[in-house]
Amino acid sequence: MHKPRLKFWDIWNMSFGFLGIQFGFALQGSTMSRIFETLGAEKDNIPLLWIAAPLAGLIVQPIIGYLSDNTWHKSLGRRRPFFLLGAILSSIALLLMPYSSAVWMAAGLLLVLDASINISMEPFRALVADKLPDSQRSYGFVIQTLIIGIGTWVASNLPKFMNNVLNISNEAAPGVVPESVRVAFIVGAVVFIGSILVTIFTTKEYSPEQMQKFEDGDEPEKDQGMIKTILGTYALMPKIMKKLGIVQFFSWFAFFAMWTLANPALTSHIYNAPKPQIEEFAQLDSEGELQYDADRVILFQDDQARLEYSEQDKSYNEASDDVGSKMGIYGLSSMAFALLLTFYTSRFAINRKLVHMGSLILGGAGFLLMYFIPGEPEMLYVCFVLIGFAWGSILSMPYAMLSSSVASSKMGLMMGVFNMFIVIPQIIAALGGVVFLQKLIGEESIHAMTVAGVFLLFAAFSNLLITDRKAIKYDPA
């Protein structure tokens, strides 16, 4: 028995929750390093502060995958209970994040936010495989990418929109997150839970009995318990997953470098507007600690120092708004890429491997170009358009290739285990990998973007390892 083909709006509605998920990820990706810098973090320490995000994924993803494979709620079904739980927790974390008063607080909330986003996200990947026949899976993952692109662009532009259009200030006292960023996070929280509710109320799931019929009546494997099942899946990983894992490793190392270091790298190299160090302008005691007045306001050396700090901080915040806005372009170009693939894959067969390889090469070129355009911020549009092609492919092609090679009954667990190849490179990068490689090239943080470009090229050519014909090609007929 085969699953029926779904109409466009059915696939759109079941993927719509990804809009909120991407609002969370995009606000995190475009503003967290800015928040860390605002709270006093050193540039070289920023990747380490991000380690909470991949650690949460490493632990949460396979557990949620297993639980969602083995859950059935009479009203919410198999995957939707996790959509709702993750949305509630993520929205709370988004509301609290911009009100952090210390680096440790922001890092802790980042852990909560990323773990909560993963609770919602992993079942969404599995839902595509649950609901769609193999001939529509690339189509389904591409529509998810289309929605992700919309979310990335809108969310990345929110702080700049709040300042330029709504006249909400992007300036604040030292150590305080600007009001424009705070309001952007509040909007993100509302969109997150709202879009998830759209999917919950418009999408029905197949029952376990129906899923068994779609598996040609095969008896489901006996459940051996969560820990044993997860460890067994790691041990008996399909070859296609291992090969795709190499591609994913290089891809996600590159994007982690972008999320953590693009803001300090580009504000310094392209805009010549680095974050000013408050210690250079404030009064310090004999031990080098900041001095405060009775209201806990930092004391400056004199009025001239206060003015210079304010001007430099204003330039930094304006540059950060612009970097975040231009980063959103990669969401738009990934959306355009997804739209093109949506129409094409609904009618014609594609070679997934070659599509993914070509997209990653373009993304690598986008990162490498950044080094050669100091003082030319408009050229960042070109860079992020190219990066968006890679991002659009990363969010769809590997999952489409994998889902064609594993059973639907284990799809949630497989997707969770597969994401090990997403979080491990990020952990390595956070523990000093990206900063170490950057400093092999030079001290300037822009070299982190060069590292990202080289790693995307490694990812592109790693696709040559993939030989599974079922994973590489599919026909919409």
Q: Each PLM stretch: what is its role?
A:
Residues 93-97, 101-120, 378-393:
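Hydrophobic core of transmembrane alpha-helices in multi-pass small-molecule transporters
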Residues 43-44, 134-144, 320, 406-418:
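Loop-to-transmembrane helix entry/capping segments in MFS-fold secondary transporters
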Residues 1-9, 101-108, 117-120, 124, ...:
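Intracellular loop-helix junctions on the cytosolic face of multi-pass helical membrane proteins
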Residues 119-132, 393-407:
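Intracellular juxtamembrane helix-capping segments at the cytosolic ends
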Residues 61-76, 337-351, 437:
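Helix-to-loop junctions at the C-terminal end of transmembrane segments
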Residues 353-396:
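C-terminal transmembrane helical hairpin of 12-TM major facilitator-type secondary transporters
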Residues 2-54, 243, 247, 251-275:
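Helix-loop boundary and gating motifs at the non-cytosolic
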Residues 83-101, 361-375:
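C-terminal ends and interior cores of transmembrane alpha-helices
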